Design a protein with these regions (language model features):
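Short, conserved micro-motifs composed of acidic
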Residues: 1-16
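Intrinsically disordered, low-complexity regulatory regions of eukaryotic regulatory proteins
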Residues: 5, 56, 73, 151-153, ...
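Short, glycine-/Ser/Thr-/acidic-enriched flexible segments
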Residues: 10, 26, 30, 185-187
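Surface polyanion/phosphate-binding segment centered on an Asp-His-Pro turn
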Residues: 12-16, 28, 33, 37-41, ...
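Non-catalytic, peripheral interaction segments enriched in hydrophobic/basic residues
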Residues: 17-144
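Short linear motifs embedded in intrinsically disordered, charge-biased segments
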Residues: 86-88, 92-217
Length: 217
């Protein structure tokens, strides 16, 4: 993007898309182009996996090739764009891993879910969710980033059974609702509630009758 200064006026050339820090941003703020470029590169790199399959049948080696040369391509900058993906784009990205699992498993491939279980892999959508949550948690430890996730000081809210720990930015549009910051705020609250449930389960009183029965067995 070029800047042209003319006396008191500043002219900016408008472009339809721009690559910023590895992510392709378009003027409509959609991620179709970014996903297209990522999946295209991932499909190109799939040749490494197909070539390796001719010489290796060890799934550990093939899995490592996939993680190094293919999966990285479809996860770069995921924190920025994951929450705004349409279902169609999510499926397009997931198909990359599905194809890779089929190659790695070879004749042992039955279903995608079973392949993931045997290779100890998460679905890409779940991995992106974990990446986003990890980013949000790390941001809480940084002074500048933690300001994006203010604690909820509303006493009435905190007294509620499902009161949120972190403020969720109000939104007037669906686009802002699914954008990165509100999404990360919701993730932090979901994680807070989940950890609170786990803590309650640990502290919950043990059923004496169950213990007695187990002891007799």
């Amino acid at each position: 993007m070029k800047l042209v200064v003319c006396e008191a006026h500043l002219y900016i050339n408008c472009v339809g898309e721009k690559k910023l820090l590895g992510a392709t941003v378009t003027s409509d703020l959609k991620w179709d182009k970014n996903v297209e470029l990522m999946t295209r590169q991932a499909n190109i790199n799939m040749k490494y996996l197909h070539s390796a399959k001719k010489f290796f049948h060890d799934t550990k080696i093939l899995k490592q090739i996939y993680l190094t040369w293919i999966r990285n391509n479809v996860e770069f900058g995921a924190v920025v764009w994951h929450s705004s993906l349409t279902q169609e784009l999510e499926l397009k990205i997931e198909r990359i891993q599905k194809a890779a699992v089929r190659v790695i498993m070879g004749n042992n491939y039955t279903t995608y879910d079973e392949g993931l279980q045997r290779l100890k892999l998460d679905k890409l959508s779940e991995r992106r969710r974990k990446i986003c949550l990890t980013f949000a948690k790390k941001s809480l430890k940084l002074k500048q980033f933690s300001k994006l996730f203010p604690l909820n000081d509303n006493d009435h809210n905190m007294l509620k059974r499902n009161g949120n720990r972190y403020v969720i930015n109000q939104h007037l549009t669906e686009r802002y609702k699914v954008s990165t910051i509100p999404y990360l705020q919701r993730l932090l609250n979901e994680d807070f509630h989940e950890r609170k449930k786990q803590f309650k389960r640990i502290l919950s009183p043990v059923d004496i009758n169950v213990c007695y029965t187990a002891g007799k067995i």
